[in-house]
């Protein structure tokens, strides 16, 4: 599986020259271990991979007993793994480092020693249980890894050429044309339904069997539920309650999370730790309400108002159709043909959130329920562009899952806040268009924002 993060690994190796370890954080099953081991095989003379979920006690004892004597530490490490390490030409991988925090703390001394490069991979690496007894090393560069994005899915499907066309047309703000748009949307629907978990994608590419794909996705969902019970530390019930309600909350027209559906009288201060846990575990994407669509969205963040999306839309589909344990092939095919009577808006909005987060955007939305009609509006997403123009850098986004829709909220937002805003977007299922200063983007162009 070709992944974009590989280029970041190459850049770290060439630019950093052993000054820092690289920590790759991501949800379980997004492909961290696979891509790091591929990198080790391709870019180093030798490597050692220590899986802290499944390693010898003798290896763990090395970190407790020999960090003061690194010559002996490395001698035993090479003996235990039967691998010869070469200074500045070998890599040591700490896989699932959250399972053994002492190894993460040791990075300070190992990097200072300078003999080898180090990559750490982990999930839940910032959760209190995994860091409370260690000093987090400053000699550590952290990057996030997400489920496969649409371009990576196209690579897996051997459809690279169409992505280049999509990029070219986005740059020129020109439509793809009927035939190529239809092909791009067909591929995008496959991506949305299968999701971006590498094993699910690989199975789909090899078999085109949705039932096998669904079995894999449900195993991942079960793994996430087990992680909540294991790592949520006193918050298990709250985190599980939120996690299980994500599909039904997104099914509603107004997708703000309603705590009253968990417990009457529930308050955000009781549950904000649970939402934080899901966001840090990268199992969910939290979208915060902003009090105004203006520059400095973090300053306008409203903690009491949020939406909670699944980090992977393929997993959301398997959660939403959970009645029969394994979703039937016929249901998947109806979903593929857009003939399943379901509120597809929740799937489309979820995958837009997923793509924006993977691009590096923090997620915000804006809503105003004023009695004045001109002030009453709901904007699905606000994103900050990297450069501030004369009109600042906030772009409002509305997401539409059907061909027939209105954009009254977006039009009101542009009228009221025109001096604050950059380009407004409608993300929809049709081809690219531009009208009255609003850019209408097909779903598959979202990752280019």
Regions found by a protein language model. Give the residues of each.
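Conserved lysine of the Walker
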Residues: 32
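Short regulatory helix/loop adjacent to the ATP-binding pocket of P-loop NTPases
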Residues: 109, 126-142, 154-159
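Short glycine-rich substrate-engagement loop in P-loop NTPases that contacts/grips substrate
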Residues: 54-88
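Interdomain hinge/linker elements that couple catalytic modules in large macromolecular machines
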Residues: 158-348, 354, 362, 368
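Conserved P-loop NTPase "ATPase switch" module shared by AAA+ and STAND
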Residues: 85-102, 255
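Structural recognition of the conserved hydrophobic beta-strand(s) that form the central parallel beta-sheet
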Residues: 93, 117-123, 144, 153
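A cross-kingdom feature that marks ATP-driven nucleic-acid transaction machinery
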Residues: 2, 13-22, 29, 38, ...
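Conserved catalytic segments around the Walker B and adjacent sensor/switch elements
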Residues: 43-58
